[in-house]
Structure formats: structure tokens, C-alpha cells
């Protein structure tokens, strides 16, 4: 995996501008919300973020993938202000689960999600190296 960072661009914080990968198995993980076994354990943005990311990592493990194999995360957030207010707690949860691996990321503000209690939904793409 090679991080793509054009020299004239400012270095991003908390994500990568691009990633190039050779070989491996590409894994696509559908949008995950912050529930566990179909039950909502958290109502706040940061709590739901933590669980959604944990769900992604649990699904990725089925392909023998690890956090560092994730190349893209797309977040769909219902409340931009809640997202911004939760950045510190989200960052702490992110580092706990992902370490210092920062894939490409996009955050999209949406008017609603199908699961009405969901504050966000995250989908992921990973490339698991051939063994």
C-alpha cells in the first residue's frame, strides 16, 4: 500500500488523499450503523461511530483483514453539528480501533438514513494482502 500525497498539497490530518494498492483481495463492506446485534447501545454520535467502526472491523476480520487494510471509508452523517461537536471523542475511538492508519475518507451530510435512530452510517473498502 502506498500513500499518495502530491508534494504541493497540504498534508491531510486524519485521512489520506489517495492510496495505491497492488494485488490482494478487495473487500467491500456495506454501510454499517451503530448498533450491535440489531440493538442500539448508544444514542450519541461518538458512541454510534465507535460501534459502526467496530462492526466494519468485525466484518473485515471474516476476510482475514485488519484495520490497516482499509483503503477507504465513506461516512454518511445526518447532523453535521453533532459530527463536529463529537470530533474529539470520535478521534479517540478511531485511534483505539484503527491505530494511526488513515485511509482515504469522505464525509457526506445526508438528510436522513433508513434506520431512523442512526446518527451516521459508514461503508468501507479494504484490500487484504495475498498470503
What name fits each language-model region?
Residues 1-71, 77-131:
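N-terminal presequence-like segments and the immediate start of the first folded domain
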Amino acid at each position: 500500500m502506498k500513500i499518495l500525497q502530491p508534494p504541493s498539497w497540504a498534508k491531510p490530518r486524519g485521512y489520506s488523499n489517495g492510496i495505491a494498492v497492488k494485488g490482494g483481495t478487495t473487500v467491500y463492506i456495506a454501510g454499517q450503523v451503530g448498533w450491535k446485534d440489531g440493538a442500539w447501545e448508544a444514542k450519541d454520535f461518538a458512541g454510534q461511530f465507535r460501534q459502526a467502526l467496530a462492526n466494519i472491523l468485525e466484518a473485515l476480520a471474516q476476510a482475514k483483514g485488519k484495520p490497516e487494510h482499509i483503503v477507504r471509508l465513506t461516512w454518511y452523517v445526518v447532523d453535521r453539528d453533532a459530527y463536529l461537536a463529537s470530533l474529539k471523542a470520535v478521534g479517540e475511538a478511531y485511534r483505539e480501533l484503527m491505530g494511526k492508519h488513515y485511509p482515504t475518507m469522505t464525509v457526506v451530510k445526508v438528510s436522513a438514513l433508513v434506520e431512523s435512530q442512526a446518527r451516521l452510517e459508514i461503508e468501507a473498502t479494504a484490500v487484504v494482502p495475498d498470503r
